């Protein structure tokens, strides 16, 4: 240990000053210190304060008056300061009052200091020699707690990550998760409060994030080759990197390892240091007490324990004699109490007896075996306890080291010499050989023997040079009789020389070291005489042998003997110093061992040896009387004063210096005090409270759990000093309750352990084998039970703040379990579930009010912060609605957190808390009902026919409908009742609005396609089409009938309907119907019947609106066709194609807007489809009729060339005459070309502009067939006439081009090569042959025969 001499001067001065203040004196052995809570409170230890209820409970008993009277006897005297030539004070009474207060303060501080020093002595002894407890290795490891500064650092690191200031690469999903974690968890005031309470660790932060992301990751779509677990582990690794920041992970790991080690096993030095801090002991005070108490001497500590246990047995007998019992709940417990006291001491004796005798100074925390061997403990029957000589056999180890020899003069320098060594009865060893000129070795021989006085022989030999010599020549020898007390260093010994050796002055330098076995406590030569043993006054060699922790014997030995000659078992003897006995010569310093009927007198040769013997025997006898050397008594008497005797054994050479130092510094009273005279219940209460303060202020998130080292010391203290288990746990519970009530986070499981122990004890279940119950224990238990119930109910009421984000893990469940236990009337009868539910229901009802009040306050703070930016903004209905929506978001967030973090008992498959889910649902409904009041108030002030409140419904409904417990609950139904009329009104107005827009739109419809309209609009960024969930239609007209503005194509329409070329009115109609249905669908109306009604109504509305659109388009189509040209100049207008496209869109939209899943509702869709099909057929028929009319016009022109008409003859004559002089153009080709151009253009326009291929095919098929039928009919009418050459050329060109054009447009061959076409082809072929014969010039290359050249020429 450290030498305290360095601090001695300074400490001496300090304590000399303090001694002038008159130290509280105490009686030599009797003053019982009774700690007072007032003095403890003035000690200034962190977090102590006043204890409130229960203050001073432990200060009862009879000790309080003793301490106070002792203090009052010699306190600071005000007169000593007021005397002398001091100027007169204007107000002596005031000054004296101040002095009195100062005196009382100093007196309390001194009393507190002395109490702590005394307590530290008891704690030191527990640490130095534990024999009951060990440091537990199975305790849950506590995490390092987060401080406010660390929390801020973590916030900054996450903010830096979100700002992109770190090197950590992350995708958007992870960024969103971190953003949410940062906003919801790290910035939460509940987390700040948890940090302040000391219950937040880095592991808590990590677990909350892990739980936070698990749902997010599970909801992500599957990615091939990447499992969800891989994503989770990757995200957690990134989280750790953010949390750690730039810190070197190796340093963090090293720090964590070190902290983990300190949480497991502490060395003695670490424990001393810890309790110095806990009790406020200075280093030099520790050093003085350590040395004076001989804490490094296990024999002294074991002896101290034996004395303490003997004192406790005597105290039990005294209590029984004087009938000074504590007040028990039953009179019959008094006798039981004595039995328990004795039984507990016997158990401690058994524990001590089971300790190995060879226990050294090292600190072994092995599991101690409980011995049930009562024969050694029972001191009544000596016959059972007698030792035989074989019981005290000792085993010694000897080391013999031969250094060198001197005096070899007669031998030649080169002669070989060597030595042998042996312990009598053992083997013989030999050194190496050396020359006579330099006989040095340094050789060690190791021996073992059972002789207490062994004979060690060392012989010196030289090698014989004679031829016939059989053995070497012995030159000399030495025989030594070492003892464990012999000098250990090498010494010169004169050798006994052999007869024929000329060198007579041989000396040998050697060392003999004989160890001291652990069970040999002292040895040496003493003069002795006794009645039963050692009956002659004679000097003998004695060994004090420890056979077991409670059995010692004084044994006398003779040389070369393993067993003692005689022995005296020291049980029941008392050793003390005596004066020299007359008539006994041979010893100088006398002492004796006395027992009823026997006295043994011992004498040593000097005073020092006597002190050592008395000290060793004092430890062995276990006597209460402390022998004081006559020299020490003289010293004490010379100093004067009534100083208590020293408990620490004092020697003239080592112990005396420590004792003098301790006495000089006023420590002797703490060392010599008898532990049995103290109220250990109140002392333990104090040390446990101070230890808890220290624990809660260290760097661990302990939640009230002591560290293993602290548990070990407190366990040992309780066992060694007889602190009742119930008292210990009651004090612990009270201290924990005080901390919990002041905001510290305490583990409910820890409270449960102590409460269950106390409840079991108070109800007579003997959890620690103690059956007696005091009235004080019962009363304190009932008081603490009530305090605990109030605390637990308060914690459940404030569960969001006492267990934020479900931390500490399992704490809420443990709190419910503990409350259920607290509500039990006894430990056997379980409390009815309904009673527990009633209590918790009441708590959760209050919790709803607390949570909503705090949420409203938070929302108002947010609102005020925003209003600060918008100063002067009035609280309009819109503002109220905006605030309500924000409040709804917070309400949902709270309910989601409750479900995620506070529904743990419901997760359990067991039925212990199966009802918790129901109560949490009730809590949620109560919470929502409070919100409903504010929501209703905000909705009431909204103007009529406004739809801004629908997002509020969507927000709440989307949350409620997915919650199994809240869906269609009380609040959910209230929400539906509130919004159902609004939805109906909205649909009514939308229906009127859309109907009106159809009516007006078609009146003004230009039938230009939307593409053409939007291509002329300015290029703008297209918004997200999913955003406008509620169509922004001006339906809030006071008259109620919505007035639709003139349609102008919005910028988004091209993006949505990029493939369509419908009209503006139709596209607007379809979008509005779709938006309305999407909006209603997105409402996800929870009530099935009303939802179906809404859907059915919207489908019917869509059906009616589309039907109206189709009919209006059909009418417009017919009107448009009637206004167009009937000649080959006709070109299919864009509007005609747009109308076809409206039909296409109508059919596509009807599938989506009019169809329902089940039964009769399909009729809407099928009716509209039939209408569209019929209308399209009619439109195709009308258009084909238009084409046929144009063809008939062409054929009418050709009819003028019929054979026999005036025009035909005139034309023929004119052409023939003119052709002689000029090149006349081919007659009829202009008509044919005009028709072919009309057909091709019409085909191209229709193919390009109409979006439905099926309609085009049907149109072309019908058009081709109708055309061929008209031509065939025209030719049939002229069956008897030969076609004019011009008619023939025109028809051939028209028929061939029509056939090829329709084939290119995809008309099937089966349609093209119809019988009608074949009839036409055959007729024209015949006519062509006839013409080629009758006309000399022929047809000028025009023929019905297929020819590529002709095609090229014609094209």
Curated annotation (Swiss-Prot):
Membrane topology field: Peripheral membrane protein
CDD domains given in the database record: PH_CADPS
Stretches for region Disordered: 1-107, 1331-1355
Domain PH: from-to ranges: 519-622
UniProt region (Interaction with DRD2), positions on chain: 792-1131
Composition bias, Basic and acidic residues: 96-107
Domain MHD1 residues, every copy: 933-1113
SUPFAM superfamilies: PH domain-like (SSF50729)
Protein name, UniProt field: Calcium-dependent secretion activator 1
Originating species: Mus musculus
Record gene name: Cadps
